[in-house]
Design a protein with these regions (language model features):
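Extended charged
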Residues: 1-29, 47-53, 61-124
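Short recognition patches in nucleic-acid-associated and regulatory proteins
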Residues: 29-43
């Protein structure tokens, strides 16, 4: 997938071109663009690779939002979701070369493998 501008994604790798709050799936009311990896030049990297999402203001800047004092869990969830999506088509080493670290710990990289034939059932 390539964005409209060379070397930059005009869409989010998590949401595509949809303009809806990532957490509430609503498109009404104001939405703010959140760069998933931010600070020290990371906003430009997030723009370049599509590492951003649309959020309602309370999910962005509210107390429990990604930038709020109680928002660590939702911030980490976004970072992990983004890394998982990136690793569907790229390696963990590529992600770490771009971002500088992994947010997935010991979680295996890449797409989940389909199980062997289970007689029509998908076992979780």
């Amino acid at each position: 997938m390539q964005g409209a501008r060379t070397g930059s994604h005009s869409y989010s790798i998590l949401q595509g071109k949809s303009k809806r709050c990532y957490f509430t799936d609503t498109e009404t009311g104001p939405l703010e663009r959140h760069h998933i990896y931010f600070g020290a030049g990371m906003r430009q990297i997030s723009d370049k690779h599509g590492f951003w999402v649309w959020l309602k203001p309370e999910w962005h800047r509210g107390t429990s939002g990604v930038h709020g004092r109680d928002g660590h869990k939702v911030d980490l969830r976004l970072k992990q979701d983004c890394q998982r999506r990136f690793e569907e088509t790229h390696s963990r080493e590529e992600f770490m070369a771009i971002i500088g670290r992994s947010y997935l710990g010991d979680e295996p990289e890449g797409k989940p493998q389909m199980p062997a034939d289970t007689g029509g059932f998908y076992l979780l």
